[in-house]
Amino acid sequence: MAKLTVKDLDLKGKKVLVRVDFNVPLKNGVITNDNRISAALPTIKYIIEHGGRAILFSHLGRVKEEADKEGKSLAPVAKNLAEKLGQEVIFPGSTRGAELEAAIDALEDGQVLLVENTRFEDIDGKKESKNDPELGKYWASLGEGIFVNDAFGTAHRAHASNVGISANVEKAVAGFLLENEIAYIKEAVEAPERPFVAILGGSKVSDKIGVIENLLEKADKVLIGGGMTYTFYKAQGIEIGNSLCEEDKLDVAKSLLEKSNGKLILPVDSKEANAFADYTEVKVTEGEAVDAGFLGLDIGPKSIAKFDEALTGAKTVVWNGPMGVFENPDFQEGTIGVMDAIVKQPGVKSIIGGGDSAAAAINLGRADKFSWISTGGGASMELLEGKELPGLAALTEK
């Protein structure tokens, strides 16, 4: 990576501003999945072990008005992080002001402070999300010219807490998580060991047009599953019953198929049901066509076998988007089958592009079998699309 990283800095005795991604799910004030907190530990530990004073910034959820602050405080995160680090995490509970500034000034080497949810600044004019220059300058002033961005999950956004701070410090560098995310995903797409197979699922073609176009140029094969299958089917005149379809994207789907030179591989059967939720009948289609009154909710067994064959010998696999409604046990076989087909390839570099795919791997017990699971759905999608990420572009060149 051509950007400076945290290892390039002298941290001892310095107040180090760090953007992390602690946007974790909470239920009744309890964190239900703390993977993102764990993912930030190597960078935080490196800073404090090298005598730095870590000042952490993160958002949590969306906050547009005062009422949205309920249940969005980072207080539970501070507690969880303190347990993981085995030391106190100072939490003044504010995003600005005299109390926060005093707490930062009182920090000693090796201590950690967590600023309150950066999106609390969105209540008055969306200052965080719109990268308000004064807010970025203020947050930068809390440190000593050093900023570490370790929040890959927001690297595709130009916010005050990443791009704004970067613009107002002497050195803005990548943390270990951001460095690894870029290395795995970008290198997989730009310089893959071949054969390189991409697998794209999810419900909407519209979400992945740019990704499909980029990967058709870079990959040897692009496998399509999930709800967007049926837009591709209908574009070819195949019956789809009541399946999800983006009518306004039929021409796009047809165009992608025509210019794919056979690289784009679609399912050959589906698992269908007579309703999305309160269904009374589930069956496998004879072929591609979905029966009238039914909707496709997963790829079928012939498709799993076809995708297994397409993955044979693959050395690089990037997967983004489940093959079906994996949250329902009736429609998770396709996602499980494809995951198992990926991880059984000898010496394969297997990368999951965050979001629902990551949740599927974790929930279905396959997470530890993959080379890398991204912490950022939107950011990884933009990398797969070949876009430059604002949070990365703002960092200091080596």
From Swiss-Prot:
Cite the EC number.
2.7.2.3
Which leading EC class covers this enzyme?
transferase
Query: What is an example of a Pfam family matching this protein?
Result: PGK
Similarity comment text for this entry: Belongs to the phosphoglycerate kinase family.
**Self-association or partners: how does it assemble?**
Monomer.
Recite the UniProt keywords alphabetically. ATP-binding, Cytoplasm, Glycolysis, Kinase, Nucleotide-binding, Transferase
- Amino-acid positions noted as binding substrate in the UniProt annotation, renumbered to this chain: 21-23, 36, 59-62, 119, 157
Q: Which residues bind ATP?
A: 208, 296, 327, 354-357
> GO MF annotations for this entry?
ADP binding; ATP binding; phosphoglycerate kinase activity
Q: Which reaction does it catalyse?
A: (2R)-3-phosphoglycerate + ATP = (2R)-3-phospho-glyceroyl phosphate + ADP
State the species of origin. Streptococcus equi subsp. zooepidemicus (strain H70)
Q: Name one GO cellular component term.
A: cytosol
What is its subcellular localisation? Cytoplasm
Please identify the protein, giving its name as recorded.
Phosphoglycerate kinase
So, what pathway does this thing act in? Carbohydrate degradation; glycolysis; pyruvate from D-glyceraldehyde 3-phosphate: step 2/5
> Gene3D superfamilies per the record?
Phosphoglycerate kinase, N-terminal domain (3.40.50.1260)
**GO BP field:** gluconeogenesis; glycolytic process
Recorded hits in InterPro entries, A to Z, give:
Phosphoglycerate_kinase (IPR001576), Phosphoglycerate_kinase_CS (IPR015911), Phosphoglycerate_kinase_N (IPR015824), Phosphoglycerate_kinase_sf (IPR036043)
